[in-house]
Amino acid sequence: MMVSCMGSLWVILSLILTLISGFSLMSSAWYKTDTISFGVFVHCIGPKNMPCNQTCIYYRTLEEIPDIFGKIAAVLLFGGWLLLSFGAVLVLSWTIIPVGLCQRRVCTPARYAQISAVVVTVLGLLVFPFNLHSEFARQICGSSFIYKSGDCCLGWGYMMAIVTVMLSCFLPFIGRYNLNEIKTKILLSKM
């Protein structure tokens, strides 16, 4: 089976954005100072110019995350990543399904999974800065407050998550264009 240009773009972007999103979730560089950085599932202590000398603590359960807003953000962001991953698996499986209407049964749920992933991830990204009001964040960032980072700087991990979700907004549209392309090919082949 030959995959269309838009179909190839949809598959490649879905897989790449899923990987980048997962990588940014596991990053400790969401908010940082010179010696401490913290993210959704990890925080590291040590000089940032010497990453080999940093000590990192990974949160394995929700109870280990220090603040309720951190827990809510973790659930939302992880849920968004799972939906994005599920959509990427569906899109990837679409490439091996034989030509026909069965493709539509995979493409449409993939698009809905990707739309849901974007919505849930945006909510998680909006909730995470509420974590700055916690006692944990105030110990690191000084006089931090909701959406005010105090002595902390915004890190590349948080920015990468924002850029990834912005690019993920295009995935359902690419999938819709791809589905229209499939329908056109089916109609033309029956004529």
Curated annotation (Swiss-Prot):
Keyword Manganese: no
Main location: membrane
Assigned keywords, A-Z: Membrane, Transmembrane, Transmembrane helix
Listed InterPro entries: LHFPL
Subcellular location: Membrane
Entry GO CC: membrane
One Pfam match: L_HMGIC_fpl
Transmembrane segments: 6-26, 72-92, 112-132, 154-174
Topology within the bilayer: Multi-pass membrane protein
Domain of life from the UniProt record: Eukaryota
Family recorded in the similarity comment: Belongs to the TMEM211 family.
PANTHER family per UniProt: LHFPL TETRASPAN SUBFAMILY MEMBER 7 PROTEIN, LIPOMA HMGIC FUSION PARTNER-LIKE PROTEIN
Protein name as catalogued: LHFPL tetraspan subfamily member 7 protein
